[in-house]
Amino acid sequence: MPTATAVENLRREGITAGVHTVGDVMYDAAMLFAPVAATKPGPAAYGLQPGGYVLVTVHRAAATDTRDALEGLVAVLGAIDGPTVFPVHPRTRHKLEQAGLWEQVTQIANLHLAPPVGYLDFTALLTAARAVVTDSGGVQKEAYFHNVR
């Protein structure tokens, strides 16, 4: 189990055999690779300063498979105060193009659209962001690990 709380929850359910606290592999990986990610350009690649932008990721079906969801995404992107970096997942871009909304996204002021980035480059962007807007549980968790709201 990743935490003592998880072990305690199992104990209360009567499950104790073979249960051990081993930590969270995602946390361990995030901490292991953070120093390596710190060597990447991060926000400087977009002419931005650490803490001076919002990072956005969106790719899940619930956020991209209906026109209403896509229009909501466009509205959120337009409402973010200040610079925003949005590495666009191919699925998300395809859905925005299909809905005829991609051109509108490209016109949003202070929005830096980028192709998808690898883990280390993404971590460099994440750790230096002022805030994160995402539909990804993994990104939410990593933002928490790095004290990004």
Language-model region placement:
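Short beta-strand scaffold positions
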Residues: 1, 21, 87, 133-134
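A nucleotide-sugar donor-handling region in carbohydrate enzymes
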Residues: 1-68
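Alpha-helix N-cap/helix-start capping motif
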Residues: 4, 24, 90, 136-137
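Phosphate- and divalent-cation-binding pockets in alpha/beta enzyme and binding domains
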Residues: 9, 29, 94-96, 142
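A short helix->loop->beta-strand "cap" motif at the edges of active sites that frequently abuts
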Residues: 16, 82, 148
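Donor-nucleotide binding loops and adjacent catalytic segments primarily
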Residues: 38-128
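A donor-sugar binding/catalytic signature common to diverse glycosyltransferases
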Residues: 122-149
